[in-house]
C-alpha cells in the first residue's frame, strides 16, 4: 500500500452526495466483503488513487527534484540473493 495513512484513525470528515442506486450498489458490495459502507468507500477510493499515482508516465520535476530522481535511479542496487538466483535460472523457453 502506497499511502499507509489510509489505515490510520480517521481525523477528517468527507461528505458526498450519491444517487440511491449508487448507495445500494456500494452497500451490496460492502456487505459481500463484510465491511461498513465507510470502510468500503475509503479502501476502494485509496486503491483507485494509488493506481492513478503509480500509473503515471510523465513526471514534472524542478531541477532539484530531477537531480534527486536521477541519483536514486543511478544508485547501486543492494545485493539480493533471491533476485540473483532468479536471474541465474535458465528460462523455460531455453530448456
Swiss-Prot record:
Processing after translation: Acetylated by TacT1, mostly on Lys-51. Can be deacetylated by NAD-dependent protein deacylase (cobB) in the presence of NAD(+).
Transcription listed as a keyword: yes
UniProt key word Repeat: no
Key words, A-Z: Acetylation, DNA-binding, Repressor, Toxin-antitoxin system, Transcription, Transcription regulation
Effect of mutating residue 90 to A: Protein still acetylated in vitro, forms complex with TacT1 which binds DNA normally
Outcome recorded upon mutating residue 51 to Q: Mimics acetylation, severe growth arrest in vivo when induced, increases translation inhibition by TacT1 in vitro, forms complex with TacT1 which only binds 1 DNA site in vitro, no change in tacA1 transcription in vivo
Positions of modified residues (N6-acetyllysine): 19, 51, 90
Null mutant phenotype: Both tacA1 and tacA1-tacT1 can be deleted without an effect on growth in cell culture; in the absence of tacA1, overexpression of TacT1 causes a long lag phase.
Matching InterPro entries: Ribbon_hlx_hlx (IPR010985), TacA_1-like (IPR014795)
Domain of life assignment: Bacteria
Biological processes per GO annotation: regulation of DNA-templated transcription
Note: There are 3 TacA-TacT systems in this strain.
Written domain comment of the UniProt record: The N-terminus is thought to bind DNA.
Subunit text: Homodimer. Binds to cognate toxin TacT1 as a dimer of dimers.
Protein name: Antitoxin TacA 1
Amino acid at each position: 500500500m502506497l499511502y499507509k495513512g489510509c489505515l490510520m484513525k480517521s481525523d477528517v470528515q468527507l461528505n458526498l452526495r450519491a444517487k440511491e442506486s449508487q448507495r445500494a450498489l456500494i452497500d451490496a458490495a460492502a456487505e459481500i466483503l463484510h465491511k461498513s459502507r465507510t470502510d468500503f468507500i475509503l479502501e476502494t477510493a485509496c486503491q483507485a488513487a494509488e493506481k492513478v499515482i503509480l500509473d503515471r508516465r510523465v513526471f514534472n520535476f524542478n531541477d532539484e527534484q530531477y537531480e534527486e530522481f536521477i541519483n536514486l535511479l543511478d544508485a547501486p542496487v543492494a545485493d539480493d540473493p533471491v533476485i540473483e538466483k532468479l536471474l541465474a535460472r535458465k528460462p523455460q523457453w531455453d530448456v
